[in-house]
Design a protein with these regions (language model features):
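Loop-centered beta-sheet repeat module
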Residues: 2-5, 19-22, 150-216
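Alpha-helical transmembrane signal-anchor/signal-peptide segments
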Residues: 34-52
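Hydrophobic membrane-insertion alpha-helices, especially the h-region
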Residues: 16-33
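Extended lipid/amphipathic-ligand handling interfaces
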Residues: 63-65, 94-105, 130-143, 167-184, ...
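N-terminal beta-strand/beta-hairpin edge segment
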Residues: 53-184, 251
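Extended terminal
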Residues: 2-19, 61, 234-245, 251-253, ...
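Flexible, membrane-facing loop/turn or short amphipathic-helix motifs
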Residues: 80-89, 117-129, 154-167, 197-210, ...
């Protein structure tokens, strides 16, 4: 009689193992996400406390932290900032705001804010700002960089005793990036700003031209660490005493038939006014500050030692004598323009 061999029971590990592994991973990821959420909440509280010590109070209405499973989202139904760093209190209020970071890429934060916004400024001024869309991004890891993109931003400035001014653009972009090629002691940050369809009342009044314009600016700011304190009198004074400079490597501004190309360097003088030297080329400018100049600028270059050569200028542009900002005044060559004195920034 033949003996029957016992049948080996098949292991069910491969049937249940993947499922159990998936459950373990899900539980571990959930634990990690809630841990990260707790860390973010704690860091927010610490950051708000540090800001309050520096004279800036942030208010995030109905604050919440969500985004499970792959994101961390900080949401505010309204966002407000009150700063006392300018003497008189400055308050900015916006609509809903959200900051988002991927759990697997926490070094990049995307920030979106809904309008409108309202700013209460010193001397009783009010600035109302609206936009179609507004988004920013901030990368913490080297090289640090920041970007802002706005569609149809529009601002209305109300100053007691003066006419209301409306500022705006069809599109605006701004990019900042720490320059990795400059010496670390320079603390250099590259800046690129472009705007299309601009409406800038002071420029309109200066040139007697209300047509929409375009601006393309590239520059490098040195001693940029001064502005980790924010943009306020203390930060500006720290930047000035550290011999900070704004190096304009490219400036192109068009407004109807008028165009200005230039470069140069700007600083703050001891009385906190903008100072420096610019190399400009221009075309189509009919007046400056109400003074009819016609073809005067083109003739100035030839009059001042033949410096009106257009060798370095774009086609159709006339190279101007050096433009200097000193002692609160604007000079073209030796001639002072009939403009209001430049006010101190702080």
């Amino acid at each position: 009689m033949t003996d029957t061999l016992p049948t080996r029971r098949r292991s069910r590990f491969w049937l249940y193992g993947p499922f159990m592994l998936l459950v373990i991973l899900a539980v571990a990821w959930s634990a990690f996400w809630f841990y990260a959420r707790g860390r973010v909440s704690a860091e927010i509280e610490n950051a708000l406390a540090r800001e309050a010590q520096r004279g800036r109070t942030w208010t995030c209405t109905d604050r919440s932290v969500s985004g499970f499973p792959f994101r961390i989202e900080l949401r505010c139904n309204a966002l407000a900032l009150t700063s006392t760093r300018w003497g008189d209190a400055v308050r900015v209020e916006t609509g809903p705001a959200v900051a988002v970071a991927q759990v697997y890429s926490p070094g990049l934060v995307i920030f979106e804010v809904s309008g409108p916004a309202k700013a209460t400024l010193p001397e009783g001024r009010l600035f109302d700002l609206s936009w179609k869309s507004l988004g920013t991004s901030l990368a913490w890891r080297s090289p640090e960089r920041f970007a802002l993109v706005a569609s149809e931003p529009r601002g209305v400035l109300t100053t007691p005793g003066l006419a209301t001014e409306t500022w705006g653009a069809a599109a605006l972009e701004a990019h900042l990036r720490r320059n990795p090629t400059r010496p670390a002691t320079e603390q250099a940050v590259d800046i690129a700003i472009s705007a299309k369809g601009t409406i800038l009342p002071p420029i309109d009044a200066l040139l007697g031209n209300a047509e929409a314009g375009e601006i393309d600016l590239q520059a490098t700011l040195t001693q940029a660490e001064s502005f980790r304190k924010g943009f306020n009198p203390d930060a500006l004074e720290t930047w000035r005493t550290a011999n900070g400079t704004l190096e304009l490597t490219r400036l192109v501004s068009t407004k109807g038939k008028a165009r200005v190309d230039g470069s140069g360097q700007l600083i703050l003088d001891q009385l906190h006014r903008v100072a420096g030297d610019l190399q400009l080329a221009a075309a189509g400018i009919e007046q400056i500050g109400g003074l009819r100049i016609g073809n005067l600028l083109g003739g100035l270059g030839g009059f001042l030692g033949g410096r009106g050569s257009n060798a370095g200028a774009a086609p159709g542009l006339t190279t101007l004598p050096p433009v200097s900002l000193r002692e609160g005044r604007v000079f073209i060559g030796p001639f002072r323009l009939p403009l209001q004195p430049l006010p101190p920034l702080y």
